[in-house]
Amino acid sequence: MEKNMKFPVVDLSKLNGEERDQTMALINEACENWGFFEIVNHGLPHDLMDKIEKMTKDHYKTCQEQKFNDMLKSKGLDNLETEVEDVDWESTFYVRHLPQSNLNDISDVSDEYRTAMKDFGKRLENLAEDLLDLLCENLGLEKGYLKKVFHGTKGPTFGTKVSNYPPCPKPEMIKGLRAHTDAGGIILLFQDDKVSGLQLLKDGDWIDVPPLNHSIVINLGDQLEVITNGKYKSVLHRVVTQQEGNRMSVASFYNPGSDAEISPATSLVEKDSEYPSFVFDDYMKLYAGVKFQPKEPRFAAMKNASAVTELNPTAAVETF
């Protein structure tokens, strides 16, 4: 990272004191110019975070590692000779919290892990909604505006992608996760504080998102770019593989409900809206097949229903 480019870290405890204005300004600057920021003193118990980290890493060793190695062999990735651009070097499973939890349906998760993840998910849900209200305040929107938009008639969707990025013998040959923007609303990431790998694209350069103990990394999805009429941006990010260390990632996605109507907030449109209006589920159906392609054609396609098929969506993506 360049010396004059300091990744934004926000201490949420300062919102309650004399430094509130400066803290709100830091959040706004991060949303406008980075699409990412890291938060500390966020209210999540450190012992719960430690428990989630330990259980996630233990679960990988006991339940996921062999499956990952089998996948490598089945796809011929156990002996990389040429660069691979259509597969990610990651082991994942998904937890859905809202509208209805699937935790009890995940058979290889222990009861203790299930209980901890349920607690963690609820706390992250509340944190996500608090953060959305902070964005509303910075944007001059009424408190609760973003939460109301996300709600639709069925409530928001909220889920967690639990990932491990094992050591890769040839990191130059394959990405842990290919570059993309996130389709949804606001993302809260609890990442490994020892093994790095997450990068975002800023001003043409890939910038490391620094591992920081007990922090939560926040990034904005495509829906917030649309609602803010481009004032805030979703940003390309990726995970690079490492030769040493198994990187843990617990990413929780607070997204609009399937029938939520997404459009630029009227107060943020000065002349003509730069972004389309659509139903969130329609956007997700498009995104599923073009996740690793630029976002701009997706926005353009949503303005013209006939153009959606031209992007040829084929792949599946977890929408929780």
From Swiss-Prot:
Residues annotated as domain Fe2OG dioxygenase: 156-256
Annotated residues for binding of 2-oxoglutarate: R247
Knocked-out gene: effects: Impaired in the 1-aminocyclopropane-1-carboxylic acid (ACC)-mediated reversion of the ABA-induced inhibition of seed germination.
Expression induction: Upon iron deprivation. Induced by ethylene, particularly in root tips and hooks of ethiolated seedlings. Promoted by ozone O(3). Accumulates in response to very-long-chain fatty acids (VLCFAs C20:0 to C30:0). Induced in roots by nitric oxide (NO).
Pathway(s) of this molecule: Alkene biosynthesis; ethylene biosynthesis via S-adenosyl-L-methionine; ethylene from S-adenosyl-L-methionine: step 2/2
Required cofactor(s): Fe(2+); Cu(2+)
InterPro entries for the chain: DIOX_N (IPR026992), IPNS-like_FE2OG_OXY (IPR044861), IPNS-like_sf (IPR027443), Oxoglu/Fe-dep_dioxygenase_dom (IPR005123), Plant_2OG-oxidoreductases (IPR050295)
CC annotations in GO: cytosol; endoplasmic reticulum; Golgi apparatus; nucleus; plant-type cell wall; plasma membrane; plasmodesma
Binding site for Fe cation: H180, D182, H237
Positions in coiled-coil regions: 111-143
Keywords for this protein: Coiled coil, Copper, Ethylene biosynthesis, Iron, Metal-binding, Oxidoreductase, Plant defense, Vitamin C
Domain of life: Eukaryota
Gene3D superfamilies documented for this protein: B-lactam Antibiotic, Isopenicillin N Synthase, Chain (2.60.120.330)
Catalytic reaction(s) noted: 1-aminocyclopropane-1-carboxylate + L-ascorbate + O2 = ethene + L-dehydroascorbate + hydrogen cyanide + CO2 + 2 H2O
Distribution of this protein across tissues and organs: Expressed in vegetative tissues. Constitutively expressed in leaves and blades. In ethylene exposed etiolated seedlings, localized in cells at the outer side of the exaggerated hook in an ethylene-dependent manner and following an ethylene sensitive pattern. Also detected in the root tip when treated by ethylene.
Cofactor info, note text: Binds 1 Fe(2+) ion per subunit. Can also bind Cu(2+) ions.
Gene Ontology biological process: cellular response to fatty acid; cellular response to nitric oxide; defense response; detection of ethylene stimulus; ethylene biosynthetic process; positive regulation of seed germination
Family, as annotated: Belongs to the iron/ascorbate-dependent oxidoreductase family.
Reported function: Enzyme involved in the ethylene biosynthesis. Required to mediate the 1-aminocyclopropane-1-carboxylic acid (ACC)-mediated reversion of the ABA-induced inhibition of seed germination via endosperm rupture. May promote stem elongation by maximizing the extensibility cells, possibly by activating ethylene biosynthesis, in response to very-long-chain fatty acids (VLCFAs C20:0 to C30:0).
Name the UniProt record assigns to this protein: 1-aminocyclopropane-1-carboxylate oxidase 2
